[in-house]
């Protein structure tokens, strides 16, 4: 961010995965634009997100339409936030996002992070003890959030995810996780990516124990 600021280049970050997990200080990190979605760690519903734009940054709108503000004007409004907004707002989504953010602020980001990381450490240790399970994480989980990716040797990631869902009623995410270049480096393209567990503030130790047992059962079926 600092290098971009010194070179006069706007610096934008995609906080879709990190908003609600990691605090963003736009001044200290020299951030000009932050894009985020509401339905992940901000605990809002789907269909809602936002764009935070630092004062002085000009973004050209790509769509135009009514805003309900100064409707007699025949051109799209040029000032923020109307420049980037048009049509009827998703008021239900906004209310849901507000409720999620309010809950997070009440609980505290640090408190949530500590709780989730304690769970993911237990999950990591449990999965690491299972023969045939390959983990994609640092040993000490430094600079980590409560997301853990893994594979079972000899098994397709999608098949593992299906068994977790159908046989164990456990939700997970399988695939390339919008990061195909990472999976090219990991060599996991042919097995369709990896299996990913995302731990949230409403997960419990019982959930973690169930997930470990389920993966152990699935791994026992692997091809040798």
Task: Annotate each PLM feature.
Residues 1-32:
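Catalytic PLP-binding core of fold-type I/II PLP enzymes
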Residues 77-91:
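A short glycine-threonine-serine/GTX helix/turn-capping micro-motif
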Residues 29-73:
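Active-site PLP attachment segment
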Residues 12-14, 35, 60, 136, ...:
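Structural detector of well-ordered beta-strand residues that form the stable sheet scaffold
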Residues 166-167, 183-224:
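PLP-dependent enzyme catalytic core of the Aspartate aminotransferase-like
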Residues 92-93, 97-144:
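Conserved PLP-dependent catalytic core of the aminotransferase class-I/II
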Residues 117, 121, 132-180, 185-186:
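Conserved PLP-binding catalytic core of the aspartate aminotransferase-like
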């Amino acid at each position: 961010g600092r290098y971009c600021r010194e070179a006069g280049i706007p610096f934008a970050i995609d906080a879709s995965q990190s908003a609600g997990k990691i605090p963003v200080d736009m001044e200290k990190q020299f951030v000009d634009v932050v894009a985020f979605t509401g339905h992940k760690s901000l605990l809002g519903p789907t269909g809602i997100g936002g764009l935070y734009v630092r004062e002085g940054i000009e973004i050209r709108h790509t769509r135009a339409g009514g805003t309900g503000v100064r409707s007699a004007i025949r051109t799209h409004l040029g000032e923020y936030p109307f420049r980037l907004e048009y049509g009827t707002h998703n008021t239900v989504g906004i209310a849901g996002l507000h409720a999620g953010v309010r809950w997070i602020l009440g609980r505290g980001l640090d408190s949530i992070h500590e709780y989730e990381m304690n769970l993911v450490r237990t999950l990591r240790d449990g999965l690491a003890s299972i023969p045939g399970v390959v983990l994609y994480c640092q040993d000490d989980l430094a600079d980590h959030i409560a997301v853990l990716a893994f594979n079972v040797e000899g098994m397709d990631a999608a098949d593992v995810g299906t068994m977790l869902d159908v046989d164990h009623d456990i939700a997970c995410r399988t695939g390339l996780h919008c990061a195909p270049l990472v999976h090219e480096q990991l060599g996991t393209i042919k097995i369709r990516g990896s299996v990913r567990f995302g731990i949230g503030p409403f997960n419990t130790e019982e959930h973690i124990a169930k997930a470990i047992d389920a993966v152990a059962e699935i791994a026992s079926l692997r091809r040798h």
